[in-house]
Amino acid sequence: MLIYEYQSTDWRITMKAYERLLKYVTFRTPSDENSENTPSSACQFELARFLKNEMEGLNLSDIVLDDMCYLYGKLPATKGYENVPAIGFIAHMDTVSDYCNHDITPVITENFNGVSLKLPAGITLSVHEFPHLGTLKERTLITSDGSTILGADDKAGIAEILTMIEHLQKGNIPHGTICIAFTPDEEIGMGAEHFNIEQFGAKYAYTIDGDTEGEIQYENFNA
């Protein structure tokens, strides 16, 4: 078991999805259901600005961070694919506010035994309580230390989207225009409230905020 400590000097563009996740969860971004502002918590802007810089480093186009903390950008189509319908990918930056959401310490468990997972805070997760754990035998798991949330909902989605962008670029994979958007306040049901569809620019889009690998939900009400 490894306890991850983020170092601000280890920022770089070439990253795997889990490395990006470990970076993003160091940002505290709980939304606030009692707020009348958008975003409901100013701290969400800190992550948004960081992501904007990363998107600029990936040479995305049409990058816009608006005054309500919606962040948009595009990966232009490769030559010959300019007329392919644009596809979009969306994830949210906020986390839940009703659990401990600060001083998050990611823990990496390699080669999981498939039976039980003991976290540093003294909590044990067992396959009897959480049967899905049995399907993760011999895989690498990323959790919190058990005293806080991790924030993978939905920072894992953000990490997956930007890693996909980098993979498309460096793999020289042909594609149409890829539109991405990172939104605030999804956890309090307001994520789509001020979403700028025209700025986003996609013909079709997926929200990367799921559960089981390979699962697709073809509609949602506020994400």
List where the protein language model places each region.
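Acidic/His- and Gly-rich active-site-bordering loop/insert found
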Residues: 15-140
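Intrinsically disordered, low-complexity regions enriched for glutamine and histidine
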Residues: 4-5, 42, 46, 90, ...
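Intrinsically disordered, low-complexity regions
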Residues: 11-13, 74, 115, 123, ...
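Active-site-proximal helix/loop capping residues that flank conserved catalytic or ligand/cofactor
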Residues: 1, 19-22, 53, 159, ...
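Short, Lys/Arg-enriched N-terminal segments with co-localized hydrophobic residues
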Residues: 1-14
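Acidic/histidine-rich catalytic neighborhood of metal-dependent amide-processing enzymes
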Residues: 134-223
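Generic structural signal for short, solvent-exposed loop/turn connectors between secondary structure elements
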Residues: 13-16, 57, 68, 173, ...
